Amino acid sequence: MTYKIEEAGKTFIYHWFVYMLGALKQIDLSSKVDVCFDREDYNAYQKESFELLSDILNVVPNDCQWDLVPSIKPRDIRNNSGQDHVDPSTYFFLRDLFLSRVDDKFDMTDYDKIYICRGRSHLCEGNREDSAVPGVRRRQIMNEGEVVESLEEMGVKCIFFEDYTVAEKIQIFNKASLIISPQSGGMVFSLFAGPQTDIVEIYPPNPHQYCDQYIDICRHLDIPFRRFTDVAKLDGYDNMVVDSTELVNFVQG
C-alpha cells in the first residue's frame, strides 16, 4: 500500500510540518509504509525530515497506485479568535514523532538564548517562488543589525536558522531557555520546545495575514509564549523597524 499526502504548500516549512507531515497521523505507522508526494524536487528540510523518519517511511515516486491521505485543514484563520487553528492532536502527534527520533548530539553550548535572524527569508523557497512577488520580503526587521547588537549585549546568540539541520533546530528549540524571533516559518519548531523555553515573537499589531499559528501551538503544548508588537510597520508585507531598547526591556520584563 502506498499513501500519497495531499499537497498543501510544502515549499513553506509550517505547511510542510503541520498540514502535510501532520497528515501521517491518519496512517497506521506500526510498520513501515510507502508514501509519495505531488512534487518530488525535495528541498533540504524535506529530505532531512525523511531521514529522521526513515524507520517508518519509505518515500517512493508518485507514478504508482496510491491512496490519497488528506492534508490537515485549518479550522480557523482569524487572528485573535482564540480558536484552534488545527486539530490540537496534530501538534502532539508531530512532537512525539520527531522528539522520539532526535538524539542529543548537537552541542548546545552558547545556544541557551537565541535570536533567529530573518534577513535571508526572501531567499527561501516559498518566498523565492512567490507567484505574485518573487523574492518578496515579509516580516523582516529592517534595522536588524541594531537589534542584533543590543541582544548580543544581553548574552543572546543571533543565528540564521537556515544554517542548521532539522534535527539541530529541534534540539535548539527543545533545550534553549529563550528564543526570540520575528514571526517566521522557523517558529514551527516551537512544536518541540521544552517547558522551560520562553518564546518571544516579534510582529506588528495589525498584520496583513494570519499569524496566530504559533500562539496556538504553544497554548496547547503549554509552552511560554509572548508577542512583542511595539514596532513600526513599514509596508503591506509587515516589514518593520524595532526599537531595540524597548525589545530588550520587554524580553527582560
Model-derived features with residue positions:
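A donor-sugar binding/catalytic signature common to diverse glycosyltransferases
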Residues: 175-220
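Active-site-proximal segments of catalytic enzyme domains
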Residues: 136-152, 156-172
